[in-house]
């Protein structure tokens, strides 16, 4: 939302239950991002979850490239499934994960598990 209430120790104005989840995210060593593949990318629910990670940032004293926030260092993994097995099936979802989670947020990639259900046809 960008209101910055969380950055000043105030309660979040977004009442979606994520505030209760924040201590668990901060305490976790590994965060597994799991989603069905929908329209060639992660689900809207997972994307909304990732976007809420803004509230776990802290001010960076020496910001690279003008970014003033820094995220805690965490390990991350991606778990996905889809109904087809084309070579490009996961391309957009993997790109989103690598750019957003690994490069922008700065989590350490611990791997991806992608499985198609083509054998069930």
Where are these regions (language model features)?
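Glycine-rich phosphate/pyrophosphate-binding loop and the adjoining helix
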Residues: 87-121
